[in-house]
Amino acid sequence: MTLRCLEPSGNGAEGTQSQWGTSGSAEEPSPEAARLAKALRELSHTGWYWGSMTVNEAKEKLKEAPEGTFLIRDSSHSDYLLTISVKTSAGPTNLRIEYQDGKFRLDSIICVKSKLKQFDSVVHLIDYYVQMCKDKRTGPEAPRNGTVHLYLTKPLYTSAPPLQHLCRLTINKCTGTIWGLPLPTRLKDYLEEYKFQV
């Protein structure tokens, strides 16, 4: 199931306006709606979710950024919730994020879709591709045969992230075993809320 863009609401991150939502009972959300709400709540904590933004606004934000800089915004296409806008060697470009059957993946042509990795959250999807780009990239490459390489390296934040969040990112980059650290339980709970490196 691909969710469609609904009416605007003011529930975006850091004062941004979001346009996505889910249908269903207001009393008891379905497991699907609860899963989606959790994933979108997680996204709102990143600092690089911009909410409602046009293609041209995204291009303007990324125009002077280095290659690999990206942001997440609400999709302007009614069949998708979100879009990655990223600066490539050919300039800013956009890639839709598909949500289907409780999973997120990059939009692609049909013959490739089944091979693309799927994730429970948008942040996990982005974290995976950022780590993959770190592992594979050694430096800028010139595009061959008209192809443009897509690298996700650095998020473009809506504003300076809180120091707490930056510390959490650093800890996540250094260890995968939060519960083994000599820290108070409350702090470990905070670290567990966001287990990603980006």
Curated annotation (Swiss-Prot):
Protein localization: Cytoplasm
Domain of life: Eukaryota
This protein's record includes keyword Transcription regulation: no
Keyword Chaperone recorded: no
Record note on modification: Ubiquitinated; mediated by AREL1 and leading to its subsequent proteasomal degradation. Ubiquitination is dependent on its phosphorylation at Ser-52, by PKC. Ubiquitination is stimulated by LPS.
CDD domains in alphabetical order: SH2_SOCS2 (cd10383), SOCS_SOCS2 (cd03736)
Residue location of crosslink Glycyl lysine isopeptide (Lys-Gly) (interchain with G-Cter in ubiquitin): K173
GO cellular component terms, semicolon-separated: Cul5-RING ubiquitin ligase complex; cytoplasm
GO MF terms, alphabetically ordered: cytokine receptor binding; growth hormone receptor binding; insulin-like growth factor receptor binding; phosphorylation-dependent protein binding; ubiquitin-like ligase-substrate adaptor activity
PROSITE patterns per the UniProt record, alphabetical: SH2, SOCS
Entry keywords, A to Z: Cytoplasm, Growth regulation, Isopeptide bond, Phosphoprotein, SH2 domain, Signal transduction inhibitor, Ubl conjugation, Ubl conjugation pathway
Post-translational modification Phosphoserine, affected residues: S30, S52
Endpoints of the signal sequence: none
InterPro entries: SH2 (IPR000980), SH2_dom_sf (IPR036860), SOCS2_SH2 (IPR035862), SOCS2_SOCS_box (IPR028410), SOCS_box (IPR001496), SOCS_box-like_dom_sf (IPR036036)
GO BP, one annotated term: response to estradiol
Principal cellular location given in the protein's record: cytoplasm
Region ranges (Interaction with AREL1): 1-75
Annotated segments matching region Disordered: 1-31
Stretches assigned to the SOCS box domain: 151-197
Assembly, per entry: Substrate-recognition component of the ECS(SOCS2) complex, composed of SOCS2, CUL5, ELOB, ELOC and RNF7/RBX2. Interacts with IGF1R. Interacts with DCUN1D1.
Record text about domains: The SOCS box domain mediates the interaction with the Elongin BC complex, an adapter module in different E3 ubiquitin ligase complexes.
UniProt xrefs under PANTHER family: PHOSPHATIDYLINOSITOL 3-KINASE REGULATORY SUBUNIT, SUPPRESSOR OF CYTOKINE SIGNALING 2
Function: Substrate-recognition component of a cullin-5-RING E3 ubiquitin-protein ligase complex (ECS complex, also named CRL5 complex), which mediates the ubiquitination and subsequent proteasomal degradation of target proteins, such as EPOR and GHR. Specifically recognizes and binds phosphorylated proteins via its SH2 domain, promoting their ubiquitination. The ECS(SOCS2) complex acts as a key regulator of growth hormone receptor (GHR) levels by mediating ubiquitination and degradation of GHR, following GHR phosphorylation by JAK2.
Protein name stated in the entry: Suppressor of cytokine signaling 2
